A protein has these predicted regions:
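Short, conserved beta-strand element in jelly-roll/cupin
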Residues: 26-27, 37-53, 143-148, 155-173, ...
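Extended, compositionally biased flexible segments
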Residues: 32-73, 79-80
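Structural motif
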Residues: 50-52, 77, 87, 161, ...
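Conserved short histidine dyad/triad with adjacent acidic residue
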Residues: 7-11, 21-38, 140-156, 190
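Asparagine-centered strand-capping/turn motif at beta-strand->loop junctions
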Residues: 80-84, 198-199
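Short acidic-glycine-tyrosine-enriched beta hairpin
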Residues: 57-75, 174-191
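A short, N-terminal "cap"/entry segment at the start of jelly-roll beta-barrel domains
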Residues: 1-24, 34, 65-66, 85-139, ...
Length: 225
């Protein structure tokens, strides 16, 4: 049930099958967003605003705010409301059916970005909100910071979706380039050579979710031409 909330699917990497599905959710003040996580579980991130999350229609509500990450195991119920003036804007990524491990928690779990340690790979920094050994055994959610410039082309062994939170840049992948700005969403299939270039003066800040889980630093560099 959305009751005034707006839900928009921006990417489905499996065309309705075993892929990652990214949705953007906007909950105005005075509205609510409730339901249950899909069969593979869902990773959420608060892009803007603040509000409250209850586990289903009962249970104690917890506050969520900008830069809060959430892991909802398969079938976990939720009810979200927005504080005034609103709206509460959420990123939601559904994992493939069967991805959620039976041993994962049965209720929603929260992770605050500011509480997570900074990790470094090359000149890029990231913080992992959820991943194997950190609340979600089957997928990883992280926020990365890319300084101005272009890194070497590389690929990853996992299936990844990236949402630009701040900054501007260019995605170099395949046979073409794609401009990036806040709200841009891209799919990086396993093994596809690519590079995210920061063409601005400030930091390019991105939200990544990939499956199966692991480290965002795991990559293979493309051979020199």
């Amino acid at each position: 049930m959305t009751d005034g909330a707006r839900v928009r699917t921006v990417l489905d990497t499996g065309a309705g099958r075993d892929g990652l599905v990214r949705r953007l959710v906007e909950v105005p003040a005075g509205s609510r967003f409730e339901g249950a996580a899909g069969p593979g579980g869902e990773l959420w991130f608060v892009i803007a605003g603040a509000g409250w999350l209850s586990p289903g229609t009962a249970g104690q509500a917890v506050q969520v705010r900008r830069d809060t990450g959430l892991w909802l195991p398969p079938g976990a119920g939720y009810r979200v409301s927005a504080d005034r003036p609103g709206p509460l804007r959420l990123d939601s990524v559904s994992l493939p059916a069967g991805a959620g491990a039976a041993g994962d928690a049965t209720g929603p779990r929260l992770s605050e970005l500011a509480d997570r340690p900074v990790e470094v790979t090359g000149d890029r920094r990231f913080r992992v909100l959820f991943g194997p050994g950190n609340g979600c055994s089957t997928a990883t959610q992280f926020v990365g910071e890319i300084p101005p410039g272009r890194a070497p082309e590389h690929s990853h062994p996992y299936d990844e979706v990236v949402l630009v939170l701040e900054g501007e840049g260019v995605l170099h992948a395949g046979t073409g380039d794609r401009p990036l700005a806040p709200g841009s969403c891209v799919h990086l299939p396993p093994g596809e050579p690519h590079c995210l270039e920061n063409t601005g003066r400030g930091t390019l800040r991105v939200l990544g979710v990939f499956h199966p889980g692991g480290s965002p630093a795991s990559k293979q560099h493309a051979p020199a031409s």
